[in-house]
Amino acid sequence: MAKKVVKVVKLQIPAGKANPAPPVGPALGQAGVNIMGFCKEFNARTSDQAGLIIPVEISVYEDRSFTFITKTPPAAVLLKKAAGIESGSGEPNRNKVATVKRDKVREIAETKMPDLNAADVEAAMRMVEGTARSMGIVIED
């Protein structure tokens, strides 16, 4: 018989930098998960993506075991890295903070494809472009 999922915990953690301190420790401690076991496994799995924030979905079972799925980094994080900026614009309709080439947007869309609800790369590109616009980033051809 399959194990029963008791709780699903969603977190966004910097790649390779999970530790028992907040926010990871309290979230997993409440679910009764072995925190150090999760941290070691997560850090090993994400060590090649240093510098990015990785969303993770942890399924906790009734016997306190767990499995987790790492997702692709948020589009905003990938756009900030591509544009070389620290944060988006506070007033994206007035202040533009950076420009990104369309081929870079395509690259980000292809990276995000598994997690986006898009039929093709063109649709994924439109989603990423919308995120860029709301951050005050201009898309160039």
From Swiss-Prot:
An example molecular function term from Gene Ontology annotations: large ribosomal subunit rRNA binding
Keyword flag Glycoprotein: no
Domain of life the protein comes from: Bacteria
Alphabetical UniProt keywords: Methylation, Ribonucleoprotein, Ribosomal protein, RNA-binding, rRNA-binding
Any single GO BP term: translation
SUPFAM superfamilies the UniProt entry points to: Ribosomal L11/L12e N-terminal domain, Ribosomal protein L11, C-terminal domain
GO cellular component entries: cytosolic large ribosomal subunit
Entry PTM: One or more lysine residues are methylated.
InterPro entries xrefs: Ribosomal_uL11 (IPR000911), Ribosomal_uL11_bac-typ (IPR006519), Ribosomal_uL11_C (IPR020783), Ribosomal_uL11_C_sf (IPR036769), Ribosomal_uL11_CS (IPR020785), Ribosomal_uL11_N (IPR020784), Ribosomal_uL11_N_sf (IPR036796)
Described function: Forms part of the ribosomal stalk which helps the ribosome interact with GTP-bound translation factors.
Family: Belongs to the universal ribosomal protein uL11 family.
Subunit structure comment from the entry: Part of the ribosomal stalk of the 50S ribosomal subunit. Interacts with L10 and the large rRNA to form the base of the stalk. L10 forms an elongated spine to which L12 dimers bind in a sequential fashion forming a multimeric L10(L12)X complex.
Protein name: Large ribosomal subunit protein uL11
Species in which this protein is naturally found: Bacillus licheniformis (strain ATCC 14580 / DSM 13 / JCM 2505 / CCUG 7422 / NBRC 12200 / NCIMB 9375 / NCTC 10341 / NRRL NRS-1264 / Gibson 46)
